[in-house]
Regions:
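A short, glycine-/small-residue-rich helix N-cap motif at loop->alpha-helix starts
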Residues: 28-37, 43, 144-145
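Membrane-embedded multi-pass helical conduit in multi-pass membrane proteins
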Residues: 202-204, 208-284
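Short aromatic/hydrophobic "clamp" motif used to bind/position activated sugar donors
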Residues: 39, 51
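Acidic helix N-cap motif at the loop->helix transition within catalytic regions
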Residues: 4-13, 22, 63
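A short, amphipathic alpha-helix embedded in the catalytic core of nucleotide-handling enzymes
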Residues: 10, 61-72, 79-82
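Conserved nucleotide-sugar donor-binding
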Residues: 47-49, 120-134
C-alpha cells in the first residue's frame, strides 16, 4: 500500500533472494485497521507453523529468528520480545525511550505472571495454529490498532496456550517521532488500548488511573496551600524508587544511562495518564499518516 518506491525495492530484493516474497495489500480494507488487514493477507500467504513479526522501520539482529523460535517449547503458543529505539538523541526522545523501557517491563512482568498486558509488534511471534484457533483478527477487527496487544489479550482470554517473553535480545527500531503532534497522536493511540481491557487488566488500569489522579490532586493542593505533605511526597518518592529498580533490571546495558531522565518521565506521566487516556477512549486520535 506504500506510495513511494517500496514495491520496486521489494521486487529487486526478491529477484536475488528466493526466500523473500512480496505481497501487495488490497486497496479494500478487510478490517477497520489498515495494518491488521495487511497482516492478515500476509499470514494467509504464508505456510510456516510459526509466524514472526517486526516492523518495516526495525532491524532485528542476526540471531533473531533462531532466538524467537527457540522459545516455542511444547505448549507455548505466543512469544513476545523487546524492541528499543536507536539512536536516541534529544531530550524528548530520551523521555520516550524511558517510556519504552517501562512498556517493555510491563509486558515482560505481566506475561511472566500469566496476565499479559502489553507487547509490541516490532518483536513478536505466535503459532499459526494459535492464529487460526481464535479466528485471526476477526474478533478485534473493529478496533483501530492493537494487532499486537489486542491479539495477545484475545489469545489469553481464549486460553489453552502458554505465553513467554524473550529477553535474550532486542530488535532495534527507528528513532521516535520528533514532531510534537505526531508524538501526541501516538501516545493517545497507545493510551486508548486500556479502555478496551477487561477483567484483571481493566482493574489494573483503573487502579493506575486512580493513583495518578490522587497524586495530581495532592500536588495541586500542596501548590495551592503552600504546605508540603510528607506522606504524599514519600509515596511519590517510593513509587520513583520502585520504578527505577524495575526499569534498571529491564533496560539493556546500553539503555541504563537513560534512566537519569526517569524523574522527568514520572512528572510527565501524570497529565499523560489523566488526559490522554480519556482522549484515547473517546477516539480522539488519527492513525499514522
Amino acid at each position: 500500500r506504500s506510495r513511494d518506491e517500496t514495491w520496486r525495492v521489494i521486487l529487486e530484493k526478491t529477484a536475488v533472494w528466493s526466500d523473500l516474497k512480496g505481497i501487495r495489500a488490497h486497496a479494500e480494507l478487510r478490517f477497520k485497521c489498515p495494518k491488521k488487514s495487511a497482516l492478515a493477507q500476509g499470514i494467509e500467504a504464508s505456510s510456516g507453523d510459526i509466524l514472526l513479526f517486526t516492523d518495516a522501520d526495525c532491524q532485528p539482529p542476526v540471531a533473531w529468528v533462531s532466538s524467537m523460535v527457540a522459545h516455542f517449547a511444547p505448549g507455548v503458543g505466543f512469544v513476545a520480545g523487546y524492541a528499543r529505539p536507536d539512536p536516541v538523541t534529544g531530550f524528548v526522545a530520551k523521555l520516550l525511550a524511558v517510556d519504552n523501557i517501562a512498556v517493555g517491563a510491563l509486558g515482560a512482568g505481566s506475561i511472566a505472571m500469566g496476565s499479559p498486558f502489553s507487547c509490541t509488534g516490532r518483536n513478536l511471534g505466535y503459532r499459526r495454529e494459535v492464529y487460526d484457533s481464535v479466528g485471526g483478527f476477526s474478533r478485534i477487527g473493529h478496533l483501530i490498532g492493537g494487532d499486537d496487544v489486542y491479539f495477545m489479550r484475545l489469545v489469553a482470554a481464549v486460553g489453552g496456550w502458554q505465553m513467554v517473553f524473550n529477553r535474550a535480545l532486542a530488535v532495534l527500531s527507528a528513532p521516535p517521532a520528533t514532531k510534537m503532534g505526531d508524538i501526541v497522536q501516538q501516545k493517545i493511540r497507545h493510551a486508548a488500548k486500556g479502555g478496551h481491557y477487561r477483567g484483571g487488566a481493566l482493574y489494573l488500569a483503573i487502579g493506575v488511573y486512580s493513583f495518578h489522579f490522587f497524586i495530581a490532586w495532592a500536588l495541586l493542593q500542596m501548590i495551592w496551600t503552600g504546605e508540603w505533605e510528607i506522606a504524599v511526597m514519600a509515596l511519590w518518592s517510593m513509587r520513583w524508587v520502585v520504578d527505577l529498580m524495575l526499569l534498571w533490571r529491564m533496560a539493556m546495558k546500553t539503555e541504563r544511562r537513560l534512566l537519569r531522565y526517569l524523574l522527568a518521565v514520572e512528572v510527565v506521566y501524570i497529565p499523560y495518564v489523566l488526559i490522554f487516556t480519556v482522549l484515547g477512549r473517546l477516539g480522539w486520535f488519527r492513525w499514522k499518516s
